[in-house]
């Protein structure tokens, strides 16, 4: 599906019906990894309209010259929300850099939000300010690695904590294929300059704490964004659950899929209670 905004057409996928959840993917990928991570949760849960968009310069949404920084990316997301679910209360979720944008949505629309999900969240856009553990492989599969070309194996497993065929398929399907179709020139214009990649405002200096049920899930071995920084924002979310999962890095969605699904399901229970609805079957 496409949403025609003033100066850009945003591609998105909408699944299910009911209370809307806006899902924001990570940097240099597209909405497919969010679908892979979260759709299994909704197999036995009705009443939720999941809206997965491709951010500008990612997936099937083009980059535009006028989008030069994170603030303008957020403007597109807010405009998209206003057009697709005008005047409605909603839930927002984001992974990695999408979690940074999701907090931007909270900053501007907290009064309309019934829930917040942050997985492997990017907290600071400045690489030098992140607290990250070194990469480690906890579950090695030497036979699998030997089947791959050395360059491919290095590319696949340089950040993975678990070496398995499931992880290989996940990265190939949800990350490498998305890298190929994204506008890398557009992405680099923002990502390679910290002043462009960061918001111009402190996204975590909320005027008031966000009262909606929140789930923050980080990987204990995440060598991309770490886990320690996410703890620092917890006081913004008095209804927040904070979880750090062992045996998982930035690919937490596949490395600890069952635990993630259980946590998201429990978070949705809390959101439904908070919003005064029940959709469990």
Report the location of each language-model feature:
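Flexible "cap/lid" loop of the alpha/beta hydrolase fold
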Residues: 103, 107, 115-147
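Conserved alpha/beta-hydrolase catalytic His-Asp/Glu region
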Residues: 127-128, 132, 147-208
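Acidic catalytic loop of the alpha/beta-hydrolase fold
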Residues: 221-225
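Conserved HGGG/HGGXW glycine-rich cap/lid loop of the alpha/beta-hydrolase fold
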Residues: 8-62
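Active-site loop/oxyanion-hole signature of alpha/beta-hydrolase fold enzymes
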Residues: 49-93, 262
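Catalytic histidine-centered segment of alpha/beta-hydrolase-like enzymes
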Residues: 248-261
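Short beta-strand/loop motif that positions the catalytic acidic residue
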Residues: 210, 216-218
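Gly/Ala-rich beta-loop-alpha elbow adjacent to hydrolase catalytic centers
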Residues: 94, 98, 102
């Amino acid at each position: 599906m496409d949403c025609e905004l003033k100066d850009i057409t945003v591609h998105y996928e909408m699944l299910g019906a009911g209370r809307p959840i806006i899902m924001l993917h990570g940097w240099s990928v597209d909405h497919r990894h969010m679908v892979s991570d979260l759709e299994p949760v909704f197999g036995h849960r009705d009443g939720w309209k999941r809206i997965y968009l491709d951010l500008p310069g990612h997936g099937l949404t083009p980059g535009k010259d006028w989008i030069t920084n994170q603030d303008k990316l957020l403007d597109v997301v807010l405009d998209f929300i206003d057009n697709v679910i005008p005047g409605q209360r909603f839930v927002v979720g984001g992974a990695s850099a999408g979690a940074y944008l999701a907090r931007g949505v909270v900053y501007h629309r907290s009064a309309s939000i019934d829930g917040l999900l942050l997985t492997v969240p990017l907290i600071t856009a400045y690489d030098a300010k992140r607290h990250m553990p070194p990469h480690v492989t906890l579950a090695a599969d030497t036979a699998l690695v030997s089947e791959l070309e050395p360059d491919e194996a290095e590319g696949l497993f340089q950040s993975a904590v678990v070496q398995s065929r499931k992880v290989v398929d996940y990265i190939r399907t949800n990350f490498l294929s998305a890298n190929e179709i994204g506008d890398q020139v557009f992405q680099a214009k923002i990502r390679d300059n910290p002043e462009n990649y960061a918001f111009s405002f402190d996204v975590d200096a909320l005027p008031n704490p966000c009262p909606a049920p929140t789930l923050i899930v980080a990987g204990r071995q995440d060598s991309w964004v770490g886990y320690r920084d996410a703890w620092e924002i917890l006081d913004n979310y008095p209804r927040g659950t904070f979880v750090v999962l062992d045996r998982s890095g930035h690919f937490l969605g596949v490395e600890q899929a069952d635990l993630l699904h259980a946590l998201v399901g429990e978070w949705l229970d809390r959101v439904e209670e908070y919003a005064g609805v029940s959709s469990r079957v």
